[in-house]
Amino acid sequence: DKDLRYDLNEISNRVSKNTSMVFICNPNNPTGTMVGSTELEDFCVSTSKQTCVFVDEAYYDYSILDGYPTMTKLVKKGHNIIVSRTFSKIYGLAGVRIGYIISNSERIASIKKCTMAGTNMLATHAAIAAYDETDFFKYSLNKNKEAINYFYNLFEELNLEYRKSHTNFVFFKTGVHIDKFGKYMKEKGILVGRPFPPYYDWCRISTGRIEDVKIFGEKLKEFYS
């Protein structure tokens, strides 16, 4: 919709007997926006009666402070739903490539039939260690919030349109084609997100160490000066 959020009513209207699955990423990538828990829960309950609903909660951990409850509770209630999580985001294990899904036993069994290989032991132990490291989790959450707030203030100062984020990035409107913007930033030693059609004049910028985020801010101000 105009706020770059899912139009769940329109999605519901398009579901038919030929629909194999409905996929929802919440919080969403690349917009960073989030569908409210009650709205999404009602949608999942209704739609899962017609087809399987896959809810990607890769950025769920960043939305905890915003009061977003997971849709895993619907799995426990027996609804035809799959919920996925990853250790690639707040846990910092992107290179390890490990995550998990939550669904009913029959659905899990059918998915396992399509699995190419099992998870290696290094990834498994790394995930367990990361999950148990609650201090690092809190540290990551706080550092991400610090960078997100810096972005908000930066875009407000430059009068740039953006969307409030519930992830580890912010989606903002550059006013120019992303290829031109990306080329400029690359020349300054900064890599920004790829194009996300049809939003060719929007950019997804990720958080990082606050000192690095501030360097981006300096170069962004130069771009619009």
Residue ranges and their predicted role:
Residues 38, 42, 183-188, 192, ...:
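PLP-dependent enzyme catalytic core of the Aspartate aminotransferase-like
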